[in-house]
Curated annotation (Swiss-Prot):
Residues 61-606 are extracellular. It is found in: Cell membrane. Expressed in the brain and cerebellum. This is Cadherin-15.
Amino acid sequence: MDAAFLLVLGLLAQSLCLSLGVPGWRRPTTLYPWRRAPALSRVRRAWVIPPISVSENHKRLPYPLVQIKSDKQQLGSVIYSIQGPGVDEEPRGVFSIDKFTGKVFLNAMLDREKTDRFRLRAFALDLGGSTLEDPTDLEIVVVDQNDNRPAFLQEAFTGRVLEGAVPGTYVTRAEATDADDPETDNAALRFSILQQGSPELFSIDELTGEIRTVQVGLDREVVAVYNLTLQVADMSGDGLTATASAIITLDDINDNAPEFTRDEFFMEAIEAVSGVDVGRLEVEDRDLPGSPNWVARFTILEGDPDGQFTIRTDPKTNEGVLSIVKALDYESCEHYELKVSVQNEAPLQAAALRAERGQAKVRVHVQDTNEPPVFQENPLRTSLAEGAPPGTLVATFSARDPDTEQLQRLSYSKDYDPEDWLQVDAATGRIQTQHVLSPASPFLKGGWYRAIVLAQDDASQPRTATGTLSIEILEVNDHAPVLAPPPPGSLCSEPHQGPGLLLGATDEDLPPHGAPFHFQLSPRLPELGRNWSLSQVNVSHARLRPRHQVPEGLHRLSLLLRDSGQPPQQREQPLNVTVCRCGKDGVCLPGAAALLAGGTGLSLGALVIVLASALLLLVLVLLVALRARFWKQSRGKGLLHGPQDDLRDNVLNYDEQGGGEEDQDAYDISQLRHPTALSLPLGPPPLRRDAPQGRLHPQPPRVLPTSPLDIADFINDGLEAADSDPSVPPYDTALIYDYEGDGSVAGTLSSILSSQGDEDQDYDYLRDWGPRFARLADMYGHPCGLEYGARWDHQAREGLSPGALLPRHRGRTA
């Protein structure tokens, strides 16, 4: 306990010397943190060493702080060391220790605002580096000095307060800080106002910095903004200082009433116009421009019973603009004297002074002008019966001139009359029809016809008035009802079979001259009422039934139809009814009335038209069939025609699928029976692009014999040609048709188109190819002349049979 007490006294003495700043104080306090107590017991580890205080900004360096010693130093040498912030941790090099003496030195100036304390650990080691004592803690506290000025948080503080505010009204608050130790007077701040002008209207709380009003007299119209100079000082007002400003703005209140600049205003207005400005009313207001306390509102107190004037406020100038909302009439009133007042948009403060010119008079003089005519009744509505004849009076659409002091005449004309139906008297405005208006006019909307009439005066600058004339076209019952289509159908012969026949009626007239319709059997024929009955279904339909069984067939009835107009119109109309035999379901039995029903809906003219149409259709079908037949026959006359005209040798045209019979006659027998049908073609032979060319003069085809007497010569020529054919095999030799022959002798096909005309063609060389090409040679070669024809006639006279024309060798066709 004695050692601890001595340690505490030493630390207190050190702190006192440091705080008093005793010059030359260098001897540090010696600490024995490991000294044993008198009872030879060690000091506990948990025993806390009081902090070591050192002032910041100490300039005498190095400065000894403290000396530590170990009790074991008497037994041998001890090495001391320290660790922690300021030694081997940032900031490094602030503290050091003499390892032999244990003295701790301050090597750098301290700044409490950066680091207010350091916690170090002290070690005692022997020369071998072994620990002699347990580590102990050293805490070094940096003592604050008043080395920081206070600082305001803002360079300029702003505040607002209403003008005329009572004393003690809060305005704003100034705030400041000090980096020194807040637990010392170095950071004890005091606020004050250095300057605010005269009189002193504001005060500041020295501790809190709140600014408040201290007396009345704040008037925005006198001073709108106050600029105060504030000061803050530490050491409770005796230390370092700093300054700032406070800008206080006074908010406006409506403490000034608006006033007119004059007691009377004089203006002029033109009659018969509206929506125009007449003049301006000037006012003054000292309150803040643009605020509700400044904006003026005008009221017309007297002189405008009809509400013809209004006053609006110009937002830029705050002047009142007098306007006309209803047209003025010079003839009714030449002068207007208005009494006008002005107030602000915001209510006036109770303590504010009343305005001396809060009201003014406005005198308005009306100028006379040429006004347009005025129709006495506009729009004018009238009615006219449907189908009114031309010249019918419709109405008199008259107008008056409001300019009583100007003697002017009015003239009338049409501006809109789409059907050109009306005629207007230019002097009186009398309107009458000039033709009959069609009920189907597209300009008749809902039974109303609309026209526009103009009235114009004769002034130098004439004015025009527009009037609307609406004419209701009254419906007239001028049409009788008729039976509605479609025509009636069949009716059962039994009175209680089937639904009966539903009859309907229509009427071209509009309501109320149309339905309901009345259906009645003609009273001229009493027998109709005994055989038939009519029952009303609704306003437009009735049902017809037989009273008892009536004969089947066509019955001609007569109905009397009447509408509901005034006066009613009626029409007697015939009705054809077909009566048939019906089954239990009330439907006509098949074929019961088929024949008779055809006459119910067709007249004689319709039947004639139907028959004529059928006959015309039949004639057209016959003409088409004949034309097709002639066309087919004409096609059969061609060069390569059908099997009947095929005269090629053993080349048969079957014109059927699968081929025909193998053995058939290769010649056309009909041509042999009628040799006169074969004649020379008219004109030169056609140019054949698909035939061989090369000879200069083609031979004309041979002429067939015109008489049966020449048949023998013709046959002999055929036999001679067959015998002289080198390609014909011997008799009774099998023919091979699948042999395609040798290659072509010609080396090129360029000779096909080498000629320029038909005269350059020569087809006689085809005869050299054998009898199979004789037909082509006859068609395109030179004619054989009279000698060939004579042989034909000779053969015919010899009476040779057609079979002689057949070749001697016939083979099978592939």
